[in-house]
Every structure is written in structure tokens, then in C-alpha cells.
């Protein structure tokens, strides 16, 4: 993969427009989770150190296109960056027809989704954005799977288009895990539905030595193995698909292990009583909410011996502590493992935070949908654009 890197470019006196993923939760005008903002700071600081006049743009939330809505304004992000950066930071509400920006200053554009045509990758809008800069920097891995005006179109028309350090680092880490992984390679795919992760499971089943399924996804595989899953969330219409995936994994020398013990309850609630059962003893009224300790230990042993671990999705309803022990044990096993580990996806990152293992994971991916599409082997439009511009 050949793309230009911002680190390698001369930026002194240049107008540099950086597309970051600053889509953070905001409550009462204050940013409530700053992980994405912290991840973007090194790129912005590097551009400043290189002597650039810096412009930053992002979307925030899902406003109606073409309408200003204070609830989705970038102002709280500007307030955060003003404290985090040792330079002037200001918001530009009107910028498409030109914006004044000085070297050593950061101008944050108002929410790109306030512009009509952003999501449809409107060419006229993209050209206006491109005309604002000498160098366009795509640094938002979290939106790299979307071909939109601020992530794709602008890069086609800017004088120079390159990847920022965050995007470049993300691609390098994912490439290391998927293109030439240290073996054995283990992938843990959780989540509620097989249907939403089917292409990921198909793609990974042929690449990995061990594919571990968790959450509602695992229930479909439990049912496919001939066990009763009671009232658990599962997809009866995908049982044959689950059987096919297991057969495909086994024919390649791998496997998709099914839990031998599970934690069940009669209802989905924070106060539900957790009961441990053998997987063959699940009753018609039970709902499976976690894997049991024997299954968790077996998976921990697999992780302990792995060379590479890709984690996307918890193995139980860890938001409720009585159904969190399986995910907690998996998290601890990843933390203790010498494997190169990558964690990605919103629920996964929440588990990483809850069990305090962030500093023990080799790489934490900032992308949700983009992370999944990369695992599926799909081409990310923003990356394809950068490759074409590097020719």
C-alpha cells in the first residue's frame, strides 16, 4: 500500500486541512468522552510544529444536512482543543468561500454535516473544501469506510492528499495483524447478531487458526451444535450458515469452539439472577447471557498461546456484572498474553475501559464500522483515494 504520509511532507507556511474523527459525545455543551480527541492531538501538534496554518474538520452526530443545529455544533470540541493545545483555536462557522488562518493557529470548521452534499460526496462541495488548502490530510480512520465530501472527494481535488499519523498507524497495525500475522492467530468476534457480522466471520474463518464467537452470535452456533438455547437471542435462519462456517474452519485446520458451560437467567435486567449451567442443560425458559468459567478458561488458554489476537465484541452482557465474568476473563487473558493484540468496536472499547487493560493491548482501533470493513477485506474508499493520489 503506497500512500503519502504527512510526517514526510514539508509544511512550513502551508495551509493544511486535516479531516479528523472528532465525533464525540457531548452533554450540556461539554465533551463527556475524549478518547477520539486525545487520539487526534499528535497529528494537529505535528502540523503546528512543522510550521503549518492548520484547519481541522469533522462531523459530530447526525444532524439534518444543510441545517445548523446548536446541539451538533463543534463548539464544545473547540473549547476542549483550546485547553489541550498551546495555541489559538477558534471556530469557523462560514468557511466554504474562504477562511483566514495564520501559521501557528488552529481553525476548526463547523460540523461538516451542516453542508448539503457532505454525505453524498457532492463534487462541488468537495472542490470548495479542496480550494481552502495546500495539503489535505485524511486522519479519520473511523470514517475511512465512507466516501463523503470531507473524507474522499476533497482528497481527489486538493493539491496534495496524504494520510495523517493516526490513520497511517491504524493501517500499519491492522496490516500487521491481518496481512502477515504471527501465528497462531485468534479472532474473537462478539455482538448480538450473526447477520451483522456474517461477512467478517466468513473472511476471518479462512484466515485465522481459531475463531472465537461470543454474545448473541455464539447462541446461534450453540443451536447449530444441537443444543437448546431456550429464549436466548439467536438467529434460527442462520443455523445452516453457522454449520457451514464451522465446517469451513475445521477443513482449514482451525475451529470455532462452542461454549461447554453458560450463564443463564430468566429475564434481561440488571437485577436478574445468574445461574451457571452445562450447555446441554439449558431449559426452554432460559436466556444465555455469558459463557461459563470452564469455557472462559479454555478460551483464555487459546489466547495465552496466540501470536496475534484480534478482538471485536464482548462474549457476554458485561454491562451487568453478573454476566461480565466471561468478558472479564477474556480481557485479562489478552492483557497477560505476549501476542500482538488489536481491539476495536464500541462495545469492545467499553470493555477495555471497564477492565482497565488499555495499556496492555498492543493497538486500540478508533474505528467501528471501518475496523469491521477492514477485517472483511473490503477496500476503504478514503484509503483507495490516498493510494490513487500517491501515484
Swiss-Prot record:
HAMAP family on file: Phosphoglyc_kinase (MF_00145)
Top-level taxon of the source organism: Bacteria
E.C. no: 2.7.2.3
Record-listed substrate binding positions: 21-23, 36, 59-62, 113, 146
Subcellular location: Cytoplasm
GO CC list: cytosol
The family this protein is said to belong to: Belongs to the phosphoglycerate kinase family.
Gene: pgk
SUBUNIT field: Monomer.
UniProt record, GO biological process: gluconeogenesis; glycolytic process
Cited Pfam families: PGK
Enzyme class: transferase
Pathway in which this enzyme or protein is active: Carbohydrate degradation; glycolysis; pyruvate from D-glyceraldehyde 3-phosphate: step 2/5
Gene3D superfamilies the record matches: Phosphoglycerate kinase, N-terminal domain
Keywords from the named record: ATP-binding, Cytoplasm, Glycolysis, Kinase, Nucleotide-binding, Transferase
Residues that bind ATP: 197, 319, 345-348
Reactions listed under catalytic activity: (2R)-3-phosphoglycerate + ATP = (2R)-3-phospho-glyceroyl phosphate + ADP
Designated name of the protein: Phosphoglycerate kinase
GO-annotated molecular function: ADP binding; ATP binding; phosphoglycerate kinase activity
Stored PROSITE patterns: PGLYCERATE_KINASE (PS00111)
Native species: Shewanella piezotolerans (strain WP3 / JCM 13877)
Keyword Transferase in annotation: yes
Amino acid at each position: 500500500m503506497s500512500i503519502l504520509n504527512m510526517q514526510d511532507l514539508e509544511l512550513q507556511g502551508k495551509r493544511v486541512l486535516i479531516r479528523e474523527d472528532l465525533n464525540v459525545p457531548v452533554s450540556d455543551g461539554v465533551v463527556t468522552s475524549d478518547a477520539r480527541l486525545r487520539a487526534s492531538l499528535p497529528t494537529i501538534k505535528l502540523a503546528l510544529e512543522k510550521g503549518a496554518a492548520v484547519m481541522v474538520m469533522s462531523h459530530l452526530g447526525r444532524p439534518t444536512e444543510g441545517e445548523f443545529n446548536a446541539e451538533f455544533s463543534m463548539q464544545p470540541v473547540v473549547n476542549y482543543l483550546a485547553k489541550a493545545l498551546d495555541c489559538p483555536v477558534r471556530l469557523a462557522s462560514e468557511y466554504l468561500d474562504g477562511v483566514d488562518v495564520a501559521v501557528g493557529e488552529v481553525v476548526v470548521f463547523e460540523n461538516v454535516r451542516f453542508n448539503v452534499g457532505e454525505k453524498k460526496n457532492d463534487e462541488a462541495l468537495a472542490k470548495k473544501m479542496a480550494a481552502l488548502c495546500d495539503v489535505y490530510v485524511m486522519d479519520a480512520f473511523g470514517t475511512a469506510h465512507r466516501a463523503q465530501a470531507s473524507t474522499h472527494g476533497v482528497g481527489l481535488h486538493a493539491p496534495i492528499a496524504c494520510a495523517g499519523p493516526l490513520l497511517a498507524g491504524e493501517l500499519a497495525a491492522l496490516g500487521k495483524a491481518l496481512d502477515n500475522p504471527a501465528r497462531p492467530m485468534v479472532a474473537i468476534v462478539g455482538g448480538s447478531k450473526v447477520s451483522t457480522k456474517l461477512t467478517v466471520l466468513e473472511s476471518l474463518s479462512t484466515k485465522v487458526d481459531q475463531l472465537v464467537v461470543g454474545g448473541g452470535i455464539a447462541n446461534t452456533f450453540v443451536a447449530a451444535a444441537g443444543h437448546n438455547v431456550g429464549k436466548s437471542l439467536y438467529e434460527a435462519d442462520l443455523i445452516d450458515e453457522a454449520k457451514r462456517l464451522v465446517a469451513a474452519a475445521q477443513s482449514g485446520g482451525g475451529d470455532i469452539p462452542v461454549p461447554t458451560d453458560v450463564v443463564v437467567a430468566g429475564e434481561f435486567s440488571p437485577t436478574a439472577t445468574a445461574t451457571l449451567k452445562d450447555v446441554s442443560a439449558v431449559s426452554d425458559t432460559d436466556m444465555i447471557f455469558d459463557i461459563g468459567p470452564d469455557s472462559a478458561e479454555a478460551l483464555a488458554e487459546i489466547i495465552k498461546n496466540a501470536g496475534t489476537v484480534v478482538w471485536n465484541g464482548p462474549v457476554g452482557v458485561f454491562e451487568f456484572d453478573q454476566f461480565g465474568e466471561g468478558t472479564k476473563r477474556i480481557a485479562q487473558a489478552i492483557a497477560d498474553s505476549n501476542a500482538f493484540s488489536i481491539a476495536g468496536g464500541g462495545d469492545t472499547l467499553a470493555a477495555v475501559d471497564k477492565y482497565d487493560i488499555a495499556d496492555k493491548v498492543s493497538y486500540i482501533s478508533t474505528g467501528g464500522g471501518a475496523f469491521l470493513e477492514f477485517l472483511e477485506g473490503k477496500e476503504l474508499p478514503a484509503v483507495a483515494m490516498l493510494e490513487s493520489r500517491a501515484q
